[in-house]
Design a protein with these regions (language model features):
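Extended helical coiled-coil dimerization/tether regions that scaffold
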Residues: 92, 129-249, 386
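P-loop NTPase switch/coupling surface
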Residues: 1-168, 174, 285-289, 303, ...
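Conserved H-loop
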Residues: 254, 270, 290-295, 298-304
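Walker B catalytic acidic pair
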Residues: 257-259
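Phosphate-binding P-loop
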Residues: 15-21, 194-195, 244-250, 282-287
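Conserved hydrophobic alpha-helix in the ABC-type ATPase nucleotide-binding domain
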Residues: 215, 270-275
Length: 387
């Protein structure tokens, strides 16, 4: 299994060795390092993907002139102060390892012995917390200026790659608002309101729709890419045209920041279920594991995943389909409990495993501290009122 270990990067003190599962949930307070962890992991996955589909020169490039760490800082817009001589990144991937010691050294990148025979092509997608800018800011794709390719510009380019697919005849119904469909017309984003037959630019949609719509569109289209031909240059096509493992996408990897943004609790539930269902679809189509990394502050997101985990646990224990539980457990749409992982980032920058292996459930205690405060203060006020 793929693992990553990060020390002394931004607020992260020592993550320990964290395994990348099909669904990996990261919980923590503001500025605790959730995005830092996910961005470092995404960068390592991207470098591995690049090496799997490109020629030998890519590995050599990332191993010299500090390219690995400098491209990490630039692309993900890290403050240079996040890194120091004590920083450490150890990535043990599918077919390569990356080790970065300090901030002023070259990364050591090593290919595993079976690299040549087993390398494959995958599709990566980082959906940042700033995703609603494509809806909230008019003509952002023309007004956003970056001297170098960074995470936001890359997101805009990826959005341009997928949005044209959803025409008026191929609109996408949103899970967070079933009466709303998204489509693109002449490069402009619209939503169609089925209850009154009206359309309006996404610019005028609610903040919840503006935040969820990019996630729903990206996961729908990117999961559909699995098994299809990859978009490669003519040079790369000549190299991989006879190798379907590299010519076709074998999996998709999502990195999604705070999917709950601006959403009502029930809509959070619908979005998470949609995300997981698309993950299941991608894993059925691909020859390699597709995965999703989520960061969250939301107890509702944790609760929804716990329902899925409890259903998965039942299916694990009762693998033979039972019609009597059809209204409770969906055997066709469940992911075994072993494919869920969840961690909490403590105040000291270390990781804590939140999965109870016996139940299994994700502990939500760290997210629900406000309930104790509410209960304590209401109790005190009630004593004053009622004696």
């Amino acid at each position: 299994m793929v693992t990553i270990h990060i020390k002394n990067v931004g607020p992260l003190k020592d993550t320990g060795e964290i395994a990348l599962n099909r669904l990996l949930l990261i919980i923590g307070k503001q500025s605790s390092g959730k995005s830092t962890f996910m961005k470092v992991l995404c960068h390592c996955r991207w470098v591995e993907k690049t090496l799997m589909v490109d020629d030998d020169s890519s590995a050599k490039d990332y191993s010299k002139e500090h390219l690995f760490i400098e491209s990490l800082k630039t692309f993900h817009r890290f403050n240079p102060d996040f890194f120091s001589s004590d920083s450490y990144i150890k990535y043990d991937g599918d077919y390569i390892t990356i080790e970065q010691n300090g901030d002023d050294t070259d990364a050591v990148i090593t290919r595993k012995s079976d690299f040549e025979d087993r390398r494959y092509n995958t599709k990566l997608c980082f959906i940042p917390s700033e995703r609603n800018l494509i809806s909230a800011v008019k003509n952002l794709d023309r007004t956003y200026k970056a001297t170098e390719l960074d995470i936001l510009l890359n997101y805009l380019l990826e959005w341009d790659e997928v949005k044209d697919y959803y025409s008026t005849k191929n609109a996408l119904r949103l899970s967070v608002a079933r009466n709303i469909q998204y489509y693109n017309d002449g490069g402009a984003d619209f939503i169609y309101l089925s209850q009154n037959g009206k359309k309006l630019p996404v610019f005028y949609a609610s903040s919840g729709v503006q935040s969820a719509m990019p996630i729903e569109v990206m996961i729908d289209r990117y999961c559909a890419f699995v098994g299809e031909k990859a978009s490669l240059s003519k040079h790369d096509w000549k190299q991989v045209s006879n190798d379907t493992s590299k010519a076709n996408y074998q999996s998709v990897q999502f990195f999604i920041e705070e999917p709950e943004q601006n959403l009502y609790p029930m809509s959070q539930k619908d979005l998470i279920l949609n995300i997981v269902n698309h993950l299941l679809m991608a894993n059925k189509k691909g020859q390699k594991d597709s995965s999703i990394v989520l960061t969250t502050h939301s107890p509702y997101v944790v609760s929804v995943l716990n329902v899925l985990l409890s259903q998965a646990r039942y299916c694990d224990l009762h693998p033979i389909y039972d019609v009597n539980v059809d209204d409770i457990v969906d055997y066709d749409h469940y992911m075994p409990s072993k494919y869920y992982s969840a961690y909490y980032i403590n105040d000291n920058g270390t990781f804590e495993n939140l999965i109870d292996s016996e139940l299994p459930m994700i502990s939500g205690v760290e997210l629900d501290g406000v309930s104790d405060w509410v209960e304590e203060n209401i109790s005190k006020v009630n004593e004053l009122i009622y004696g």
